[in-house]
Amino acid sequence: SWNAALALVCGNSVVWKPSEKTPLTALAAHALFGRAVKRFQDEGGSVPHGLATVLIGARDIGEVLVDHPMVPLLSATGSTAMGRAVGPRVASRFGRSILELGGNNAAIVTATADLDLTLRGIAFSAMGTAGQRCTSLRRLFVHDRVYDSFIPRLKKAYASVSVGNPLESGNLIGPLIDKAAYDAQQSALSEAKAGHGKVFGGERVDAGFGKEAYYVRPALVEIAEQTGSVEKETFAPILYVIRYSDFDEALRLHNAVPQGLSSSIFTNDLREAEIFLSVRGSDCGIANVNIGPSGAEIGGAFGGEKETGGGRESGSDAWRAYMRRATNTINYGRSLPLAQGVTFEVE
């Protein structure tokens, strides 16, 4: 919805096609927009008809927008696979696209980290919204000196977190969106086990809503190598934990995935923090220090690198992508100045 707001502020009309899995949030946001428009009109303002429209439907509706010549700019949020299909199709008609794609986000816990702060940051980033944020934490690299003291504390947090109806007070973990998300989680955990990973959690939970409700305990996987499912984004609460002993090794592992959305480091070493934020460090579009990778950093440019797509929303430059830019030169005199002082005399 923030993409739609940016486009509107820049003077565009907007057609919003939400995921077919989450139509109600789009309709709710659109209803709020309708109330704002009505208030503006009641006070004498004028709003063009059809300024904002919500289209509810499946993939075929999205494909119409992708291919339509009257959609000069398409902002798409989704998987990397979706971006691979959408980007070239929009470009083939010389349209523009902003792609916000998959994220396999990581955090590094160094030997100097404040472990109390780190525990809270990791727990929220990895378990919040049942791991269904594009910026959810999915990989964790923990220094050898603090691994054996920190990971048991993290497991305790995983074991104690409440799973159930998110509308009830006290529940922190709600359901997965559907069976496909549950199957993806279980498949990733099976692959991790086959790769000698130690899985803690990940079981299905009966929250009293029947067999079509997919509540699960968040999973923590201790694994020696970053291969297989660790290199992919699984949109579910799975946190892969890898031990490291050298800071350069942690940076190499951190960057050794195709995605590049969000990242973080927990450290009290200024040099490590500065390196992480430099060209030698995180190769992601978002890099944080002593706070997790998740959240809506509305004040800063939001987006990633590599297979995350390179698009940016929010922040001070967000408006640029939603405007058609033109360079204008106006001559108010009676002489004709030419570029670079060129002389071109004719009679």
Where are the model-predicted features located?
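Rossmann-like NAD(P) dinucleotide-binding subdomain of oxidoreductase/dehydrogenase enzymes
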Residues: 1-117, 244
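Short, solvent-exposed loop/turn segments at the edges of secondary structure
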Residues: 2, 9, 101-104, 133-135, ...
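Gly/Ser/Thr-rich beta-alpha loop segments that engage phosphate groups in nucleotides
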Residues: 13, 59, 80-81, 85, ...
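Residue-level detector of anion-binding/catalytic polar loops
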Residues: 13, 96, 198, 260-262
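Glycosyltransferase donor-binding loop in the core domain
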Residues: 21, 141, 177-180, 239-242, ...
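ALDH superfamily catalytic-core signature
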Residues: 35-36, 67, 81-225, 252, ...
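Conserved C-terminal structural/oligomerization subdomain of aldehyde/semialdehyde dehydrogenase
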Residues: 42, 46, 71, 108, ...
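Residues that line or immediately flank small-molecule/substrate-binding pockets and catalytic motifs
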Residues: 56-59, 78, 144, 268, ...
